């Protein structure tokens, strides 16, 4: 992060007009702060294109929403998988799962990243988002998991989210 300052976003600013006029065109700032930890605000940030982690500044907890300057989109309808990769997947010693054990993925991320952005407040927020049912927002938190087939041990994972049919992490 190489910005000189972090702009504090309010819940009220998370609307199409403000974001279209002030955030998207700004190619100098891509990190912001948000002190509203509500599920509604987190989902609004996601739907506006932000990927949020967290930060503690002066003993205060904030979401750290990032609006990336560049994105990548995978078109799975036209995805080519080579024969070598198909064979590797078929004969793999690993099992790929989605949403099998969210809490274990969360713990693995915290253990792997010693200076983790997943501190107590952010962890609670993620757990509450994961428990969210029938929220009418087309938002769903997703844990992606890779297990060793021999011992069922979680080898790798990540947490992202889906809005409608689009996955982001």
Go through each PLM region and give its residues.
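N-acyltransferase acceptor-side catalytic subdomain
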Residues: 1-169
